[in-house]
């Protein structure tokens, strides 16, 4: 037996939840489908936990100005890596809980915690249930991919899905890819005492187009950790 709906939304991340809000203005015949981790990429493993660790790093980095401001004892301050990660994870959990409490937690039968696959253009198999929808919105997002040649290194390879699950900070870290995410995490971890090396095959960092700005950015970031 098939369930008939006007709209099926695959993916309960930021895009999928936004789609729900738009669909609800037009119809109450819809389902939201997601069999993976809930709470949005931004709140779980993206911009929110990254900003938490960036703030910790900025707070610690600022100790270098204390003597100038008449504050003594900066040289005796130190980072407790386990406490840093516990703090970041506590904030991350708060962010995720707030997302869930205002989205999927309030849904009834409209939310289905299963994976979907297409049987026909308008027919989905969701778990062991068939759902036919007049319209299907695909909002599955993306996830990091580890090249097959690198997989032999096992848990030495970290992605943005892994790094905020660490119980402590690594002693050293190579950041491969110096886009916005690589730069902000590389700088933050370097400021917290991790020996960071940045690696990118491009001649510019942060996708900066202006040659003069790109050159200055490389000089400034290069003072914090080496760039290859």
Language model features by range: what are they?
Residues 13, 115-117, 179:
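Conserved acidic residues
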């Amino acid at each position: 037996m098939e369930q008939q709906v006007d709209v099926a939304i695959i993916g309960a991340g930021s895009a999928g939840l936004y789609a729900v809000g738009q669909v609800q203005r037009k119809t109450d015949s819809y389902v939201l489908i997601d069999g993976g981790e809930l709470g949005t990429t931004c709140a779980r493993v993206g911009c929110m936990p990254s900003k938490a660790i960036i703030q910790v790093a900025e707070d610690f980095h600022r100790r270098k100005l204390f003597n100038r401001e008449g504050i003594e004892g900066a040289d005796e301050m130190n980072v407790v890596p386990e406490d840093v990660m516990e703090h970041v994870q506590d904030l991350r959990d708060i962010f995720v809980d707030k997302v869930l409490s205002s989205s999927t937690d309030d849904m009834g039968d409209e939310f289905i915690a299963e994976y979907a696959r297409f049987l026909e253009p308008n027919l989905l198999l969701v778990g062991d249930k068939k759902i036919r929808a007049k319209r299907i919105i695909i909002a599955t997002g993306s996830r990091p991919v580890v090249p097959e040649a690198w997989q032999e290194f096992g848990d030495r390879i970290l992605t943005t899905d892994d790094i905020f699950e660490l119980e402590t900070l690594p002693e050293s870290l190579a950041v491969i890819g110096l886009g916005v995410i690589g730069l902000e995490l590389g700088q933050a971890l370097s400021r917290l005492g991790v020996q960071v090396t940045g690696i990118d095959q491009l001649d510019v960092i942060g996708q900066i187009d202006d040659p003069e700005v790109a050159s200055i950015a490389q000089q400034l970031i290069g003072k914090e950790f080496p760039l290859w």
